Amino acid sequence: MGSEISKKDITRLGFRSSLLQASFNYERMQAGGFTWAMLPILKKIYKDDKPGLSAAMKDNLEFINTHPNLVGFLMGLLISMEEKGENRDTIKGLKVALFGPIAGIGDAIFWFTLLPIMAGICSSFASQGNLLGPILFFAVYLLIFFLRVGWTHVGYSVGVKAIDKVRENSQMIARSATILGITVIGGLIASYVHINVVTSFAIDNTHSVALQQDFFDKVFPNILPMAYTLLMYYFLRVKKAHPVLLIGVTFVLSIVCSAFGIL
């Protein structure tokens, strides 16, 4: 492997990251755009090593949902590790471990703080007929957009400097990243998978027990989303079922159960 990644390559990566959500879907979220953005540099790193390139692309095509303005930092970090030939499990583990926290940080800074504050200030200007309002908001938004290039360079720089430490502690990092990754996935299950059983049982003429609210949620909150996710994982991993088939089955089950008053 071995290649020379230039600043121009990293800058290009930063701009390509702007299309992170161009192929957004609910199976892999941003995986398509993430892989597309990194592909030119991955080709430069792996050159004629098609199995290596295939493995890298396969890892990058796995589920990812992170903040579009900060994704460049993660891309730069992963590229620096790819360039140094780090273990695939370590690279994959760090990606899984970091995309969730990066999403949380980005949402807190940009969507929930900076942009709402700027929107309030600029709306005040605009309501008074001041042209500065829309111009200022647009300028801030553009600044945030172009900062993704800077974040990409920061991620690449940090990755290169930290690579020796990663090599020395790769097994520990991989294990820690795996544990953190599983924790993140658990949070994603609770956030994205919703099953609400409305079925209830009458005890007498005036009292009834709601199956989910009075039983499942009291014993183990979110047990149904977790159970259904594990069932889908079983069909995907063990039975090798096609994801589209499972999505279709889930869609049909939702309609049928809703029609019969179960969900």
Swiss-Prot record:
It is a multi-pass membrane protein. Its main location: membrane. This is N-acetylgalactosamine permease IID component. Signal peptide: none annotated. The keyword Membrane applies. PANTHER family: N-ACETYLGALACTOSAMINE PERMEASE II COMPONENT-RELATED (PTHR32502), N-ACETYLGALACTOSAMINE PERMEASE IID COMPONENT-RELATED (PTHR32502:SF5). One of its GO terms (cellular component) is plasma membrane. The keyword Membrane applies. The chain crosses the membrane at residues 61-81, 98-118, 131-151, 178-198, 215-235, 243-263. The phosphoenolpyruvate-dependent sugar phosphotransferase system (PTS), a major carbohydrate active -transport system, catalyzes the phosphorylation of incoming sugar substrates concomitant with their translocation across the cell membrane. This system is involved in N-acetylgalactosamine transport. It is found in: Cell inner membrane. InterPro entries: GatZ_KbaZ_carbometab, PTS_IID_man. The EIID domain, with its homologous EIIC domain, forms the PTS system translocation channel and contains part of its specific substrate-binding site. One of its GO terms (biological process) is phosphoenolpyruvate-dependent sugar phosphotransferase system.
